[in-house]
């Protein structure tokens, strides 16, 4: 069991996770070393609304001035992270929650001054993750990072991709509420980056699936071997550890 798997669970999925999801994590853990990265967008938006703070996005990134960063940190590192950790432990999965600023885990480069405290992963302190895994814990990572002793918000997809690339992970799994990419009503089980681009250009992939496959393509460019898009409300893992969904690679052949 030497290969790493990174599982990215979006904030909109956290309240939909059922027993099947946790059973799938158990199956993955029998074959691989598992790391989970989570989002928290809906809860952040709700908290910002309660605080009468404007929520704004540019090019898919949350504009994060200081007052927004305080809320992002409170939600991601606090309630959202701990809720997922407790849920894993309730299903007899040993988990430790931490954020990207703990132990300098995720060191970031600021994206631009115009969008505030938003960073891109430039370095991952993998020794911390490996240490937790070697003690049979699943690291559960809140996507915030650190630069010059300041905390930055990180897009959860790119945080997961950065961690997967740093660990030379065998696979990055995006947990969604759909079965994967559909073509003429049928699930596309295996594809590559060139076919995905063609699907987007020809309108096969539309709506909410576009950002998911774009995140998959970005992950491949960062060095991840393969990316799977799966339905987290269903059994998405074979007993072999293979995913049931759409698997995207840089080439048509899947190792």
From Swiss-Prot:
The record marks 8, 212 as: Transition state stabilizer. Its main location: cytoplasm. Keywords: Amino-acid biosynthesis, Arginine biosynthesis, ATP-binding, Cytoplasm, Kinase, Nucleotide-binding, Transferase. Its EC number is 2.7.2.8. One of its GO terms (molecular function) is acetylglutamate kinase activity. Pfam families: AA_kinase. SUPFAM superfamilies: Carbamate kinase-like. Substrate binds at residues 40-41, 62, 153. GO terms for biological process: arginine biosynthetic process via ornithine; L-arginine biosynthetic process. InterPro entries: AceGlu_kinase-like_sf, AcgluKinase_fam, ArgB, Asp/Glu/Uridylate_kinase. It catalyses: N-acetyl-L-glutamate + ATP = N-acetyl-L-glutamyl 5-phosphate + ADP. Belongs to the acetylglutamate kinase family. ArgB subfamily. Catalyzes the ATP-dependent phosphorylation of N-acetyl-L-glutamate. This is Acetylglutamate kinase. It comes from Bacillus cereus (strain AH187). The lineage of its organism: Bacteria, Bacillati, Bacillota, Bacilli, Bacillales. The gene is argB.
């Amino acid at each position: 069991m030497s290969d790493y798997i990174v599982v990215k669970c979006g904030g909109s999925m956290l309240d939909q996770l059922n027993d099947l999801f946790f059973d799938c994590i158990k199956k993955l853990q029998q074959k691989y070393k598992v790391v989970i990265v989570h989002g928290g967008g809906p809860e952040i938006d709700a908290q910002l609304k309660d605080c009468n703070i404007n929520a704004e996005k540019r090019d898919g990134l949350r504009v994060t001035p200081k007052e927004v960063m305080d809320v992002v940190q409170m939600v991601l590192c606090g309630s959202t992270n701990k809720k997922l950790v407790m849920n894993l432990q309730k299903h007899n999965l040993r988990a430790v929650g931490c954020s990207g600023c703990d132990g300098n885990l995720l060191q970031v480069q600021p994206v631009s001054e115009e969008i505030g405290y938003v960073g891109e992963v430039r370095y991952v302190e993998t020794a911390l993750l490996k240490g937790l895994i070697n003690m049979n814990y699943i690291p559960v990572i809140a996507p915030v990072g650190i630069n010059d002793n300041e905390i930055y918000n990180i897009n959860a997809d790119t945080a997961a991709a950065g961690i997967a690339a740093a660990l030379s992970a065998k696979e990055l799994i995006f947990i969604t509420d759909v079965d994967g990419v559909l073509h003429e009503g049928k699930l596309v089980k295996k594809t590559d980056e060139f076919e995905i681009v063609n699907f987007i250009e020809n309108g096969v992939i539309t709506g909410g699936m576009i950002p998911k496959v774009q995140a998959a393509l970005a992950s491949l460019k960062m060095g991840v071997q393969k990316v799977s898009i799966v339905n987290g409300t269903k059994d998405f893992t074979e007993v072999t550890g293979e995913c049931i969904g759409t698997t995207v690679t840089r080439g048509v052949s899947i190792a």
